[in-house]
Amino acid sequence: DFIGKSGQNSVFLRGKSGQNKVFLHGKSGQNIFNSMINRKLDNIIANHYAQQSTALLLSGARQVGKSYAIRKYGQQNYTCFVEVNFIQQPEAIQLFRNAKSVADFLLRLSTFVQQPLVKGETLIFFDEVQVCPDILTWVKFLVESGEYRYALSGSLLGLQLKDIRSIPVGYLSEVEVFPLDFEEFVRAVGVGDATIDALRNAWENHYEVDAMIHNKMLQLFDLYLIVGGMPAAVQTYLDSNDMQQVIQVQQDIIRMYRMDIAQYDVAHKLYIQNIFDLIPSELNAQNKRFILKKVDRNIKFSRSENDFVWLADAGVALPTFNVEAPCMPLLLNKQRNLFKLFQNDVGLLACQYASGIQMKILNGETDINFGAIYENLVAQELKAHGYDLYYYNSKKYGELDFLIEENGEIWAIEVKSGKSYRNHNSLSKCMFCDEFHVKRSIVLCNDNVHVEDDIMYMPIYMIMFLQRHRRMEQMIYKVDIRGL
């Protein structure tokens, strides 16, 4: 996010001459949208405003690119783009809270930004709405007026908006934003459509990938393990190729997350910070399951559950829950007190490990627990692609790294970072257990594409093609009430 002086308004106008005049927390006329990063989010935003009349709310963790995406779209597609940031401009909170009507609200807004609003040609962006949740109660009335389009964004929304007195259902569409996924990353570093399409074809039809392309993709995968998907870290890498600069950006983001913990939950901040700081070491343990007693020997899960929920709702951690059995639906088999806790970005995870791990990853050194890092990346990809996160562990059958639901089926995913990727006793046992519902098995590894004994062995980088498909079939059902 681009941060300027407190109280600085953000307005974009396109004049008749075609020249842009920009005041976006930078110098007048400065074009800040020259990034090489193109995101799937850009298309989601464009499709929303082309197809729907609702306001758009972007939620997600800090520094994942929410505000930037809205500013970019607003600058490029609207005659007038107006932004109010409730953290940088706290005086706006009381100003809008005292509004008596939609007309009064819009008059206050126009006066505040010192700019007339152009009907039908203006996008109004309210940023950092977590500190002014009452703004959401206005959304219904603003959208109903139909004069302008609206966008909202904020962090920690899962925490701050729980007590909103009136969520505008039917007037607000929410999109959760995540760090760049692996496909977005490789496109940013220069991999073209032809290569992506060839890889997708290999994924869908189980073709072996050309050896040269396969090796290059593994190198890019290793690079992604340390750069991650935070837009600022990716842009820093693209600009400099300097890993030390990338690490500095990542460290700043981690510090910001810890500051948020201290600011937004004063009572439990020490517990939450301890949980957050323990994520790397817990993932490095043999079973990767989070052990609560490492936070406090005397605390019970029932007392600390909200601390874990805080991290999940803030978007900075990805809980992956154990299930009693790999059976449909997974949600009903979920064990909420048994879980793994992954970082929201694999680059941040690598940054939290020992100094120098980045070069060890790039050099392929074997004294690193790649399993934890690989699994974190897979969790991150699955979450960004629409899947809920589950795994299975039992004394009888062993452990399945991930379970997902796809088109009414359960798929099991094993993540293997070493050469012994064919050793997966747990997967084999669960596949042929009649009590379980595992219909497809995928082993993500460093080898090329091949299928053996009904198990798909796929290169780890092909996780980028595993996207959730929500199949909507027509369901017509009518109850015969004659005779009642």
Indicate where each model-derived feature is located.
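Pre-Walker A adenine-sensing motif
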Residues: 36-50
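Conserved lysine of the Walker
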Residues: 66
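Hydrophobic positions on the alpha1 helix immediately C-terminal to the Walker A/P-loop
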Residues: 69, 73
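Short glycine-rich substrate-engagement loop in P-loop NTPases that contacts/grips substrate
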Residues: 88-120
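Structural recognition of the conserved hydrophobic beta-strand(s) that form the central parallel beta-sheet
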Residues: 149-155, 176
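Accessory nucleic acid-recognition modules appended to NTPase machines
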Residues: 234-407
